[in-house]
Amino acid sequence: MLPPTACSVMSWMLLSCLMLLSQVQGEDSLKNIPSARISCPKGSQAYGSYCYALFQIPQTWFDAELACQKRPGGHLVSVLNSAEASFLSSMVKRTGNSYQYTWIGLHDPTLGAEPNGGGWEWSNNDVMNYFNWERNPSTALDRAFCGSLSRASGFLKWRDMTCEVKLPYVCKFTG
């Protein structure tokens, strides 16, 4: 028979192992996103479990977000890891987009009030665990509060832009 404290120690060890296992499995699943079997509308592309569409008619950030919300579960695109960033980069480059910037769902609704750029978030409320700034928006002299992909970085890195500028945009939505 085990002493009463042994059960709580063993329970704690088991819980710790299970938590560690789930974290490790989660990391592997991000690296190998299975190709989704979803049907996306004409003019959009599937990646993971979402559809992505680039719209070339320029809109302000807010109007682009509203346009994306007309699609099921739609918002301006959130870029959650480097694999998704690479997918978006090649998608935007393939279209022959002539603009220097393209809207994504990144914005700072606090207008810089949070220290160290802490106010930036995705329009669909996805958690920001991946960062890929072309320049640090909290230290720039000409700070702006809406996010875009930058042509100078091959559409891989993010740049803060004035929200009222009209740019092409990428929507991410369910198929």
UniProtKB/Swiss-Prot annotation:
Disruption phenotype: Mice are more susceptible to salmonellosis, but not listeriosis. The lineage of its organism: Eukaryota, Metazoa, Chordata, Craniata, Vertebrata. Zn(2+) binds at H107, E121. Disulfide bonds join C40-C51, C68-C171, C146-C163. It is linked to Overexpressed during the acute phase of pancreatitis. SMART domains: CLECT (SM00034). GO terms for biological process: acute-phase response; defense response to Gram-negative bacterium; defense response to Gram-positive bacterium; response to bacterium. Residues 47-172 form the C-type lectin domain. A motif (EPN) lies at residues 114-116. This is Regenerating islet-derived protein 3-beta. Proteolytic processing by trypsin removes an inhibitory N-terminal propeptide and is essential for peptidoglycan binding and antibacterial activity.
